[in-house]
Amino acid sequence: MDPVMVDAHLDLAYNARILERDLSLPLDRLREVDPHPETPLVTLESLREARVAVAFATLFVDPGEGGLEDWQEEVYAQLALYEAWEAKGWMRILRHGRDLEAHLARHREDRIPGLVLLLEGAHALASPEELAPLRQRGLRMLSLTWATRNAYAGGNAEEAPLTDLGKALLREMEGLGMALDLSHLAEEAAFQALEVFSGPVCATHANARALMPSPRHLSDRLMEALRKRDGVLGLVPFNAFLDPGWKRGDPRLPLEAFLRHKVHAEALLGPKRVGLGTDWDGGFGLEAVPLGLDRHRDLWSLGDEAFLGENWLRWLRSWF
């Protein structure tokens, strides 16, 4: 049986709706017609080609644009888009544990990706009670913040602790059987969340702060805390997250820059708790990823089946 890939972070609906990219196209065709300066890396076809069995697909709204009503409207529009894709047979939303194993069996034959839905940032929730309707439609994961602070917690770009409302939201997540994504969370709030929340935890898309000094990435101390919870870290092959000296417009970094983060994370978390979280087309494109990576299929050149898929599948099976 061929190994499969799991990508723990893809902004598919955001790309389709906000950037108006037709993700049903072959990737080469999308690159021909796409008007954006960043060359796209992802379409549904490129995921099938690479045997991406599971992708954590986001519901993402920029908290710097609009207000609560706008955010809520867009979250539900993105959710409806995923449901429409599922109705067309382009992908499958994985809502329950039984869906995961059934999907993996079918994926061997049809290579249709399965999506685990992730709300990236809780700013679109007016209260913890607004989480339940989203869970009923398939949401399984939540990150409390996207960069800036909100009513629930501080973010990586705006430090603040976990709030009382944030604690209530974490309790709501536990009751709904959801997982917590520590990405974009202020470190103080992340440690507080680990104390409050007893459910499954991970970081879908972050790198090693020891190699990339920035609050956006995980410190060694937070990696060790994640290890104690048997969580998984998804590493991001994005040059600006790999080398503090790299800036947009610079030549692409060698693949070794990404592998350094993998080695560091595996030393702290163990090789079974590090995986892939590309965040591809999340504000950058081909020009900003390491050399040798043109699309998902090229990640197989890393030759590590555990890192590319098995570690995330083990984590999902432990709670999903």
Description of each model-found segment:
Residues M1-A160, D164, P213-F320:
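N-terminal hydrophobic targeting/anchoring segments and the immediately downstream early-domain regions
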Residues E159-E195, P200-H205:
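Loop-centered beta-sheet repeat module
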Residues L185, A206-A208, V236-A240:
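Histidine- and/or cysteine-centered catalytic micro-motif in compact active-site loops
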Residues E188-R229:
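Aromatic-anchored, glycine/proline-accented short structural segments
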